[in-house]
């Protein structure tokens, strides 16, 4: 099998514009892709780690990741009329449950990671007077994401995305 460098645009990030909030509601979701006007999507995994040193380690620690918060920083230009951007921009002054929805990421192999999410740090416009409006927000996963293999035949127990 030949090795391939995937390009970032091959990843697909979507949000539910119907505002469903649990994985039980996936079949009710109205998915909108974050693509038009979007320049960068940067995934992040903020980890909680235990680094307890034990005597048998002679004072040195081992690292155990005990928790994780997954998020996606999304930036680009505001495109009025785009379903995903319009939905997110409409939540700019929202708080609490109004910022919750469903999201899914499909990697280049077709594997899907779906999760309840919170829309954070929404910037619906901004920039110089003679420039396209900026658009950015953070999409934060709530709880452990559900991973579906590329065949779509079922949920895997692996929470990683190693292609």
Which residues make up each language-model segment?
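Acidic glycine-/aspartate-rich tracts in secreted/extracellular proteins
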Residues: 79-81, 144
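Solvent-exposed edge beta-strands and adjacent loop segments
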Residues: 2-78, 116-133
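Short, surface-exposed linear patches
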Residues: 64, 94-99, 124-127, 140-143, ...
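Viral virion structural and adsorption modules
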Residues: 1-4, 138-140, 144-163
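Short beta-strand and beta-hairpin "edge-sheet" elements
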Residues: 104-148
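Short, acidic/charged, Gly/Pro-enriched secondary-structure junctions
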Residues: 83-116
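A generic "cationic amphipathic patch" detector
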Residues: 87, 132, 151-152
């Amino acid at each position: 099998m030949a090795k391939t460098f995937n390009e970032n645009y091959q990843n697909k990030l979507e949000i539910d514009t119907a505002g469903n909030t649990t994985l039980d509601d996936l079949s009710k979701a109205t998915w909108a892709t974050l693509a038009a006007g979007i320049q960068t999507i940067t995934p992040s995994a903020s980890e909680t780690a235990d680094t307890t040193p034990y005597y048998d380690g002679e004072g040195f620690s081992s690292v155990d990741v005990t928790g994780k918060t997954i998020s996606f920083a999304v930036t680009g230009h505001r495109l009025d009329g785009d379903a995903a951007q319009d939905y997110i921009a409409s939540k700019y002054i929202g708080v609490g449950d109004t910022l919750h929805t469903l999201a899914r990421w499909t990697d280049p192999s077709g594997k899907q990671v779906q999760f309840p999410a919170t829309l954070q740090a929404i910037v619906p416009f901004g920039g110089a007077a003679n420039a396209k409006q900026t658009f950015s927000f953070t999409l934060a996963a709530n709880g452990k994401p559900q991973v579906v293999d590329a065949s779509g035949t079922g949920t895997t127990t692996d929470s990683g995305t190693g292609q």
